[in-house]
């Protein structure tokens, strides 16, 4: 069965200000705009006069917004996460990414390998099956940052106690960007 979800509706920003008109940010914006126009970008720039953000201070709200962005994406989804577990939120997030990929959306995922650590054999099996589903999908690109050669808990513990450079070389980014238009950052 197909689930139909409402399209993403941009919330009113809690804080907005006019776009920069001088200084380095204005120059960067002008350069990016000129480059996009050179490449034939047909993006609607009707909201180009403002920039803003909305604080999402509750985990439940942040998850709902992430799912809404995933559900509304039509072209691309880019994610970077330090932690990605096979808990209920991780399973929901993964299922929505798979649904988006089924709609033809290109999904790119980068996960820090330390953040994929499973604490039980059942969690490891679920994590690996989720990963296999995503890797097999033609519209999903899944990459592990600083991956460990050992997949098990003891093997990883050994690696981390003997290789301090790997232990301290982490990707702690947390972001989701839909259609290069809206981004959620943070945990």
Stretch-by-stretch model annotation:
Residues 1-2:
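N-terminal Sec signal peptide cleavage junction
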């Amino acid at each position: 069965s197909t689930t139909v979800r409402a399209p993403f509706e941009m919330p009113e920003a809690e804080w907005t200000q006019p776009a920069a008109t001088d200084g380095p940010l204005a120059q960067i914006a002008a350069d990016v705009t000129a480059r996009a126009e050179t490449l034939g970008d047909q993006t609607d720039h009707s909201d180009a006069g403002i920039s803003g953000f909305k604080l999402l201070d509750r985990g439940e709200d942040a998850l709902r917004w992430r799912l809404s962005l995933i559900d509304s994406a039509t072209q691309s989804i880019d994610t970077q996460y330090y932690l990605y577990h096979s808990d209920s939120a991780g399973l929901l997030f993964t299922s929505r990414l798979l649904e988006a990929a089924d709609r033809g959306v290109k999904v790119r995922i980068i996960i820090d390998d330390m953040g994929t650590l499973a604490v039980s054999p059942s969690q490891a099996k679920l994590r690996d099956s989720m990963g296999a589903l995503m890797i097999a999908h033609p519209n999903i690109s899944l990459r592990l940052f600083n991956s460990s050669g050992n997949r098990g808990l003891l093997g990883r513990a050994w690696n981390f106690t003997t290789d301090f450079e790997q232990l301290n070389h982490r990707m702690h980014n947390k972001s989701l960007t839909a259609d290069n238009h809206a981004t959620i950052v943070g945990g």
